């Protein structure tokens, strides 16, 4: 795995989120759960919808109830801004109606309801609705929009733009991590039963492609084609800034530059084909489809 191996404060337990017995042993004497376990995102989920439902939904309520029974104080759930679906509203806040377009986002919305219906003063539930993550990380993904565009532009000098007008909120991976730490350390009354959007830059897919193109030294061609992905939304993240004083420290342009620097230094191998960077390819390689 890509987790730190020599951190005395980190105990890595290999297990399955569906294994309640293992979870019961692992969660004892802990204060908080940050729930990140899921098959992400829509394309990966659709490879094996049955497995996707088991991982993303069926085992969620048992984990929430177990955490509550074990006296865990705080449960932070990583939902998704895709729960909003298509929105014409200029600024989509946390109060907007949920109109998920896919099973992946539908199960995210249902898990939100499950968590909030089980919270009390001794079991605090908080929901994060992240934008799409971008930038370099130890567990690198190159199947997310900004990272896809940067990888293609750098290595093939071509960016394929599917659609173009769809709005896609994004957030740098380092700020995404910071948002979880912010919620984890916040005053109880500020995060109890709260939902927070986390995504401070909302650009169209075409605008993202142009940003990438501008950062590549060589000439990069943009190729346009139709897209079946109609998700489009402009999320407003003012709430987490106002209540928790959270502001991003990095932006999309820095994420692009970070990736280019990594490519220049050849820190990632075979970035167009290495299954480790693409969830679908990884699932196929270990027969999860």
What are these regions (language model features)?
Residues 113-168, 173-184, 212-214:
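NAD(P)-dependent short-chain dehydrogenase/reductase
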Residues 35, 61-103:
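Conserved Rossmann-fold NAD(P)-dependent oxidoreductase catalytic core, especially the SDR/UDP-sugar
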Residues 107:
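Active-site helix of classical SDR
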Residues 30-36, 77, 197:
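Rossmann-fold scaffold of SDR-type NAD(P)-dependent oxidoreductases
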Residues 43-59, 92-100:
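Short alpha-helical oligomerization interface
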């Amino acid at each position: 795995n890509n987790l730190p191996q020599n951190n005395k404060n980190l105990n890595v337990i290999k297990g399955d989120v569906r294994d309640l017995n293992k979870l019961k042993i692992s969660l004892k004497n802990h204060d908080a759960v940050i729930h990140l376990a899921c098959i992400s995102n829509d394309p990966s989920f659709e490879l094996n919808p049955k497995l996707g439902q088991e991982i993303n939904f069926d085992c969620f309520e048992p984990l929430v109830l177990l955490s509550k029974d074990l006296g865990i104080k705080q449960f932070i759930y990583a939902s998704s801004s895709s729960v909003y679906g298509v929105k014409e509203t200029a600024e989509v806040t946390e109060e907007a109606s949920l109109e998920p377009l896919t099973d992946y986002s539908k199960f995210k919305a249902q898990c939100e309801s499950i968590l909030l219906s089980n919270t009390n003063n001794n079991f605090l539930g908080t929901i994060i609705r992240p934008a799409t993550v971008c930038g370099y990380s130890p567990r690198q993904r190159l199947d997310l929009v900004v990272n896809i565009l940067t990888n293609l532009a750098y290595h093939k000098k071509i960016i394929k733009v599917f659609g173009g007008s769809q709005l896609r909120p994004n957030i740098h991976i380092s700020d995404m991590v910071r948002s979880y730490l912010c919620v984890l350390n916040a005053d109880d009354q500020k995060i109890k039963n709260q939902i927070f959007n986390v995504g401070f830059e909302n650009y169209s897919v075409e605008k993202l492609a142009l940003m990438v193109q501008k950062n590549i030294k060589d000439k990069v061609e943009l190729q346009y084609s139709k897209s079946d992905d109609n998700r489009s939304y402009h999320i407003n993240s003012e709430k987490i800034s106002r209540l928790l004083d959270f502001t991003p420290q990095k932006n999309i342009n820095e994420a692009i530059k970070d990736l280019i620097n990594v490519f220049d230094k050849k820190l990632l191998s075979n970035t167009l084909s290495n299954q480790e960077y693409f969830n679908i390819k990884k699932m196929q390689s270990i027969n999860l489809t």
